[in-house]
């Protein structure tokens, strides 16, 4: 996002890191894409993203390019990142989905979808992007950072403390402190999803 904002002449700077990989995964529906073999099979299909123009769509574009597809070769559909995304692929309203956990883990555990591309692991992410791809972070306009150094430092300190805690916490400890809605009614799925994403979390900001 900081790079795209620069192109719009809105200078932004990221100042502390939460995710060192996008933590997004692309899956295809086992209902509408039973004969899926390769990325090019998605041509003309409906691909669910968290929202149009979101980071999930940007990552999808990178992945699809590996299969020789451009942004106009598929129809991107905004489906959110929770229960709506799960129901849309189960009902066949979309053919593929790029999303986060616990959505991805739910679909894979229940056999609703097949994993096609995974950026929840640093090495796999680097293979798609040709290098590191920092993801979740705090960023702000350069002018705000220059005028509010103490606020920026306080935010940085808080995220670093959270990063350090997450790097050592057990999945069970994490589940105890997140809102109940994040568990999507299945604590075990949430725990599995967190463990699957641990590698992508920055340990130190």
Which sequence ranges carry the predicted segments?
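Short glycine- and hydrophobic/aromatic-rich loop-to-beta-strand nucleating segment
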Residues: 25-27, 137-140, 144-145
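Short, well-ordered secondary-structure micro-motifs
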Residues: 87-89, 126-129, 149
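Short helix- or helix-capping micro-motifs
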Residues: 107
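Active-site-proximal catalytic alpha-helix in oxidoreductases
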Residues: 128-140
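Short, solvent-exposed loop/beta-turn-alpha elements that line the ligand-binding surface or hinge
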Residues: 34, 38, 120-131, 198-205
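Short, glycine-/small- and polar/acidic-enriched structural segments
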Residues: 1-81, 85-101, 112, 116-119, ...
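Secondary-structure end/capping motifs
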Residues: 145-205
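Conserved, function-defining micro-sites of small-solute handling proteins
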Residues: 91, 103, 139, 147
């Amino acid at each position: 996002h900081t790079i795209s904002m620069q192109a719009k002449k809105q200078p932004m700077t990221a100042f502390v890191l939460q995710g060192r990989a996008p933590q997004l995964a692309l899956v295809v529906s086992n209902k509408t894409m039973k004969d899926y073999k390769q990325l090019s099979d998605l041509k003309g299909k409906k691909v669910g993203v968290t929202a149009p123009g979101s980071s999930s769509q940007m990552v999808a574009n990178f992945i699809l390019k590996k299969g020789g597809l451009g942004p106009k070769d598929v129809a991107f559909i905004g489906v959110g990142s929770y229960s709506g995304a799960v129901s849309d692929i189960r009902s066949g309203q979309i053919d593929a989905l790029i999303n986060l956990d616990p959505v991805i883990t739910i679909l894979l555990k229940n056999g609703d979808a097949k994993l096609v591309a995974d950026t929840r692991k640093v090495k796999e992410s680097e293979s798609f992007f040709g290098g590191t791809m920092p993801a979740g972070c705090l960023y702000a306009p350069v002018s705000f950072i220059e005028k509010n150094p103490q606020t920026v430092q306080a935010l940085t300190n808080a995220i670093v403390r959270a990063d350090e805690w997450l790097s050592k916490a057990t999945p069970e400890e994490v589940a105890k402190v997140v809102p109940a809605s994040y568990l999507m009614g299945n604590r075990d799925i949430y725990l599995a999803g967190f463990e699957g994403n641990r590698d992508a979390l920055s340990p130190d900001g």
